[in-house]
Amino acid sequence: LERAHKYDLIITGSTWNQEILKARGLTHVVNVFQGIDHTLFKPIRVNNLFPDRFTIFSGGQLEYRKAQDVVIAAFKEFQATHNEALLIFAWANQWPLIMLTIANSPLIKGVPEISEDNKINYSSWLESNGLPEGSFIDLGTPANREMPYYLASADAAVFPNRCEAGTNLVAMEAMAVGLPVILSANTGHLDLINDSNCYPLAKQAAVKPFKPYAGVDGWAEPDVEEVLTHLETIYVNKVEATNRGQRAAQSLGNFTWDNQIRELLGFVDDLCR
């Protein structure tokens, strides 16, 4: 805090982040959300990359904070009654020690093995956690320009994250292309959610501190059954899901990098006057 008070300005990436600093007596704090590349992430026509499958996308580096354990638990139950369900994911994590935090979850067992060339073996891990072979696809580390292609193949996206300091760029990109998105209603995600642009996860409990995260105030534990309920709703009512996806894209329409950088530079200009 002593060092923070010495800065002329602190810029945060979410309202939650800003409020934490203000609650600790820092008054020189402003908020600027990150932007989206709208030349790539915009409402696009659904492709048929995975025909005859109900495809669910999950993105973000594998770790307890990102709650892929919740995705796995919910998908396992959903796929048991919908054999055509397919989980596609981009969970690459360049920080193995952070990835190991997923073992903190009681919903899954073990962690993926990492080869000598630092490749993560998701297949055996997911199968050992009850996902049938052929029910999931690891997208690896696709280039950002390739992501709209994969998102356009999905019927839904799931982000049950326990905490987001910012606003979760992958979730923003999924919403911007018009996907029906299941989104945990906590921390930075709250800046993305309105009454009708997603399927919010509101049934949440407190998170207990765990290494290396000693402070988890504001974090929230999502409810697996609520994720499952939303997946069933999207599966059954595709018209409403499409409408929510369209409203999601509209709500993210102003989050262009041009707009966000202009706002950022405005604060810097004010500081220099």
What are these regions (language model features)?
Residues 16, 35:
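Carbohydrate-associated surface elements
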Residues 36-52:
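Acidic anion/phosphate-binding donor-loop and adjacent secondary structure
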Residues 149-166, 179:
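Acidic donor-binding loop of glycosyltransferase active sites
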Residues 257-273:
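C-terminal alpha-helical cap of glycosyltransferases
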